[in-house]
UniProtKB/Swiss-Prot annotation:
Gene3D superfamilies: Flavin-binding protein dodecin. It comes from Escherichia coli (strain K12). It is found in: Periplasm. Keywords: Periplasm, Signal. Belongs to the BhsA/McbA family. Pfam families: YdgH_BhsA-like (PF07338). This is Uncharacterized protein YhcN. Its main location: periplasm. Residues 1-22 form the signal peptide. GO terms for cellular component: periplasmic space. PANTHER family: OUTER MEMBRANE PROTEIN, OUTER MEMBRANE PROTEIN-RELATED-RELATED.
Length: 87
């Protein structure tokens, strides 16, 4: 249940605009019409969901992705997120 709450919170935050990012966070319906090009994972200690989003954006940009979908997220004292990348 905690994972679903974290993913839902990240999805809501990804809809809000906090500056220019190279890759857009998308949902499962939007991902169906795109070409998957790989996955990335990020992790950290004691940081905010926005830090996770910024790290995912940076990795997506480095891989040449225009969008990503968060497929897994865990939080607590340490956190981890995995995202599928799309063109």
């Amino acid at each position: 249940m905690k994972i679903k709450t974290t993913v839902a919170a990240l999805s809501v935050l990804s809809v809000l605009s906090f500056g220019a990012f190279a890759a857009d966070s998308i949902d499962a319906a939007q991902a169906q019409n795109r070409e998957a090009i790989g996955t990335v994972s990020v992790s950290g200690v004691a940081s905010s969901p926005m830090d996770m989003r910024e790290m995912l954006n940076k990795k997506a940009e480095e891989k040449g992705a225009t969008a990503y979908q968060i497929t897994e997220a865990r939080s607590g004292d340490t956190w981890h997120a995995t995202a599928e990348l799309y063109k």
